[in-house]
Amino acid sequence: LHNRDLVAVEAGAGFTLRDGEDGADHEGDGEHGGDAGHDGEAADHDHVHLDPHIWLDPQGAAHIVGQIRDALAAAEPEHAAEYRKNAESYLQDLAALDEEYTAGLAQCERRVFFTTHAAFGYLAHRYGLEQRAIMGLAPEAEPTPKALQAVVEEAREHDVKYIFFETLVSDKVARVVAEEIGAETLVLNPFEGLTPEQIAAGEDYLSVMRQNLTNLRLAMGCR
């Protein structure tokens, strides 16, 4: 960070951030229903947790690419044409991904999905879905038994067949909810890191997002 030639890019600048979903009550937060916060701020209902996961919306990812393109072109004008060319190619890939999501999630039996980590709010909003998070923006937080039971009851009401969890975090809570309602667990990857196996297999943002779409379509009963 002390490198004077380092280019810092505020990738989300200019993109409208959404309030984060706090999810269920967490151990140590007290009983504040779905409005409970994190990091000891449960009682501060005026504190807003902004959701940073804009890259999980393909259009948000496109915004990030544009920000990086412009910053690099400004920092190295002699390579600006190359940066713009590469960015344009990737933006076309992202536009195709966006179209796949739009078509793939257009006709589904369910519009609500349950996940341990509230990382998919932008994706849900973009494609007309509703995210229900068990553990809010902090994927390691433990919900209280009372809050967990409320999640179980709501999942039953929606006839949920799958509870999502993410690759790099324990699936314990997802399994508890799934077992209570006779559902299964399935991965919804927030692309916050790749396993060594995924790296070796050449996985990237596009492949992970397409697998997410496949899993969403299965869970939502899409045609």
Each predicted region: which residue ranges?
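Extracytoplasmic metal-acquisition and chelation regions
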Residues: 1-223
